[in-house]
Amino acid sequence: MSWAALLGLLAVLLLLLLLLSRRRARRPGEPPLDLGSIPWLGHALEFGRDAASFLTRMKEKHGDIFTVLVGGRYVTVLLDPHSYDTVVWELRTRLDFHPYAIFLMERIFDLQLPNFNPSEEKARMKPTLMHRDLQALTEAMYTNLRTVLLGDSTEAGSGWQETGLLEFSYNALLSAGYLTLYGVEASPRTHESQAQDRVHSADVFHTFRQLDLLLPKLARGSLSAGDKDHACSVKNRLWKLLSPARLASRADRSSWLESYLRHLEEMGVSEEMQARALVLQLWATQGNMGPTAFWLLLFLLKNPEALAAVRAELKHTVWQAEQPVSQMTTLPQKILDSMPVLDSVLNETLRLTAAPFITREVMADLALPMADGREFSLRRGDRLLLFPFLSPQKDPEIYTEPEVFKYNRFLNPDGSEKKDFYKDGKRLKNYNMPWGAGHNQCLGKSYAINSIKQFVVLLLTHFDLELGSEDTEVPEFDLSRYGFGLMQPEEDVPIRYRARL
C-alpha cells in the first residue's frame, strides 16, 4: 500500500474517531436518543428510504417522543396527537417554521427574497384565498375546469379515451388552477381563446410535472449530474412561462396574483426572482390537488358502494337545485356545502394519503409539556418533527382497520359529519391533519376543497369513467414523497373515459 493511501486511511480513521468522540449523550429530562450505527449520518439512509416505516419502528422502540440523528441533525419526533397543539401554537421565538421554509425555498426553487417574512406574506395572501375573494376564485375555477374538461371532450368526440388516472386528474386540476390564479388568454372568452388556454395550461402542467418528479431529490440534495441538468432546464422553462412580463397580458388575473405581485414589488424583488416566486406558488397552491383527486377517484372506482353513495348524493343535491349541473355556469357554495358523503370520502382519502412533515426549528432551550403531564427538554438548534400520517391518521386506537378505505368513516348515523374520535379515552382535537395546523395551517384549504369537489361533480355528471382492468390494484406509494404533502403512486393507474352526449 502506498504512503498516500495509508495517509488517506489514517485521515478517515481520525475523522471517525473525532465523530465518535463528539457523539451526543442524552441528558436527564430529554427524550430517548437514538444515534444509529453510522457516525454523523445516523439514521439518514433509513429515514430517506421509507420515513413512515422507520418512524414506526422508532415509536415501537422508544414511545411517542424520541430524538434521532439524521445527517448531522438531531430531530425530535413527536407522535402524540393530544400534544400537537403545544407545538403548532408555540411562539416563533421558541419554535419556528421559517428557517426550514427558507431553506427549502432556496434549495428547491433557487429563490431568495430580501427581508422575507413568511408571516407577513401569509397575512397578505389570506384575504384573497380564504375570505373576501374565495367565492370569485371558486367560480373562476369551475369555469376553467369546464374549459379544460368539457372543451377537451368536445374536441375528442364521444369515443373512449385511454390515459392514466393521475395524469388525467393532475393535468385537469393544475391546468384549471393555473388559469384561475394566473389568468386566461382573453376576456370575453371565445372558442379560439379557450382552445389556446387548454394548450398553454397543458404546457405549464407538463413542464411543472417534470419539476415535481424531481422535488424529493431537490429537497434532499441528491440529484445526479444528469438530473441537475434536467432540473436546470425545466426551471428555466417554468421561469419563462410564469415571468411577470409574460403574465402581464393575461386577462382575468386573480386578486391573489395582483396582491402577491404588489407584495414582491414592494419588497424590491427583481423580475427574475418574481418568476421563481410564482413557480413556488404554483407548487404551493396546486401541487396537492391533482394527487388528492387521483386517490379519491381510485378509491371510488375500487369501491362500488362508495361510488353509488356519492352518485346518489349528487343526484339528490342537484335535484334540489334550480337547474341541472350541465346548465350551471357556476356551482353555488350552498351545493358544495351540501355533500356530506363526498366530504367524508375526501376526508378519508386525505387520512390515507396525506403525509406532510410538520417541522419547527428549536430556537431556544425549552421544556415541552405533554398532554399526559410529562415534560421533555429540547435543545436549541435541534429540529422538532410531527408526523400526523402515523398518528392520528393511521393509528389503530383511533381508527378501526386504519389501512382500509371506508367512505362513511367521517359520517354519523344521521348523515352529519363525524368529529368525535378518541385516543387514550380522551376526545381528539386533531384527528385528521392533512392541512397542517396552528400558525402554518394551509391558507388554500377552502379553495382546494371546493376545487376538488367541483372536479368530481363535473366528472361524474359529464363522463363515464372506468378502470382499464377489473383486477387493477391500488398502487404502492412512491416512498420518496413522505414529508411533501400528498403521497403519489409508484405508477399511474390506466383508465378509460368518454363524454356523455
From Swiss-Prot:
Gene3D superfamilies (UniProt xref): Cytochrome P450
Residue ranges of the TM segments: 1-21
Catalytic reactions of this protein: prostaglandin H2 = prostaglandin I2; a hydroperoxyeicosatetraenoate = an oxoeicosatetraenoate + H2O; (15S)-hydroperoxy-(5Z,8Z,11Z,13E)-eicosatetraenoate = 15-oxo-(5Z,8Z,11Z,13E)-eicosatetraenoate + H2O; (15S)-hydroperoxy-(5Z,8Z,11Z,13E)-eicosatetraenoate + AH2 = (15S)-hydroxy-(5Z,8Z,11Z,13E)-eicosatetraenoate + A + H2O
EC number from the UniProt entry: 5.3.99.4, 4.2.1.152
Membrane topology qualifier: Single-pass membrane protein
Entry keyword Ligase: no
Cofactor(s) the protein requires to work: heme
Major subcellular location class: endoplasmic reticulum
Residues that bind substrate: 107, 113, 288, 359-360, 383
Pfam families: p450
Keyword check for Coiled coil: no
Keyword list, A-Z: Endoplasmic reticulum, Fatty acid biosynthesis, Fatty acid metabolism, Heme, Iron, Isomerase, Lipid biosynthesis, Lipid metabolism, Lyase, Membrane, Metal-binding, Prostaglandin biosynthesis, Prostaglandin metabolism, Transmembrane, Transmembrane helix
Cellular localisation: Endoplasmic reticulum membrane
GO MF, one annotated term: hydroperoxy icosatetraenoate dehydratase activity
GO BP field: apoptotic signaling pathway; cellular response to hypoxia; cellular response to interleukin-1; cellular response to interleukin-6; decidualization; embryo implantation; icosanoid metabolic process; negative regulation of inflammatory response
One of the record's GO cellular component terms: endoplasmic reticulum
Domain of life: Eukaryota
Residues binding heme, per UniProt: 442
Protein family: Belongs to the cytochrome P450 family.
Function according to Swiss-Prot or TrEMBL: Catalyzes the biosynthesis and metabolism of eicosanoids. Catalyzes the isomerization of prostaglandin H2 to prostacyclin (= prostaglandin I2), a potent mediator of vasodilation and inhibitor of platelet aggregation. Additionally, displays dehydratase activity, toward hydroperoxyeicosatetraenoates (HPETEs), especially toward (15S)-hydroperoxy-(5Z,8Z,11Z,13E)-eicosatetraenoate (15(S)-HPETE).
Protein's recorded name: Prostacyclin synthase
Encoding gene per record: Ptgis
